[in-house]
């Protein structure tokens, strides 16, 4: 199974980025929280590619420190380059 984001989810993630611009950690945290709240989950590659969050793990850690109950689910999928890789898929609990 290839790790590809469905078009409807890509569009939703791109809209979140467009509607919530900014490079700051707080802006990235806001986009991640909106993605988790509205879409139910997001993977690290989706956060990097579609939410412009270069260090999603750091942002997740900061959000957890603020009290958000974010759960990580590990999954192994094929990357766009065709290699197997372990990804984190995050959800709100």
What is each stretch, according to the model?
Residues 27-41:
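Short amphipathic alpha-helical interface segments
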Residues 2-26, 60, 64-93:
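DNA-binding patch around the recognition helix
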Residues 23, 50-51:
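Residue-level marker of alpha-helix boundaries and capping positions
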Residues 53-58:
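Short, basic interhelical loop/turn and adjoining N-cap
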Residues 41-50:
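Short acidic, hydrophobic short linear motifs in intrinsically disordered regions
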């Amino acid at each position: 199974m290839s790790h590809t984001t469905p078009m409807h989810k890509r569009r939703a993630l791109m809209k979140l980025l467009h509607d919530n611009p900014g490079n700051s950690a707080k802006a990235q945290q806001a986009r991640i929280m909106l993605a988790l709240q509205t879409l139910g989950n997001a993977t690290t590659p989706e956060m990097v590619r579609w939410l412009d969050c270069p260090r999603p793990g750091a942002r997740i850690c900061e959000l957890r420190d603020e009290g958000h109950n974010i759960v990580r689910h590990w999954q192994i999928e094929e990357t766009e380059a065709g290699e197997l890789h372990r990804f984190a898929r995050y959800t709100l609990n």
